[in-house]
Amino acid sequence: MKKKLYIVGVTAALACALVGCGKKDTTADAGVYVKDDVIEFVNVELPTAKADHDSAIAAYNAYFADGSNQDLSTYKDTLQNTAIPTMEKCITTISGIETATDEVKALKDTYLQSVQKEYEAMKMVVSAIDGENADYLTQADSLISEAASLMNDYQTQLQTIANEQGIVVNQ
């Protein structure tokens, strides 16, 4: 009986020792995981949405370009038929991106908030043209400023993560 208890005790101690030896260093794995997730997000997932975003912003800014001869009606049509639908597509694309880490989710959320502010500003400009209400233009300008601030936050967050993970970011 004592022999059986001794064997059970030694076996249990050996099992506990072996389980402890197999423990992974999760901090090193987490770093690799964040690095891979950032690279996937920035290089694979985001470029399609960024292309739509850039296209919509170019349409929005065309009215303000030097030498532009668009009238307000044409500008409104461009916003309604090109820029706003393209921004909606961009928002849908970004919203559909799945991230694996909290760090990249925060990046995605900041980028998405910036794009949503620009989208709201475009809709506000259309409303201003329809109603000729100067307050709408002031609100749109405020939204654009908020969007720019959020995009700066995104760039800062991205650079911080890149520095921590040893990633080179080409701007």
Regions found by a protein language model. Give the residues of each.
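Alpha-helical segments in soluble extracytoplasmic regions
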Residues: 34-114, 122, 127-130, 134-170
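Sec-dependent N-terminal signal peptides
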Residues: 6-13
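Bacterial signal peptide processing site
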Residues: 22-24
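C-terminal motif of bacterial Sec signal peptides marking the signal peptidase cleavage site
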Residues: 17-20
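Positively charged n-region of N-terminal signal peptides that target proteins for export
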Residues: 1-5
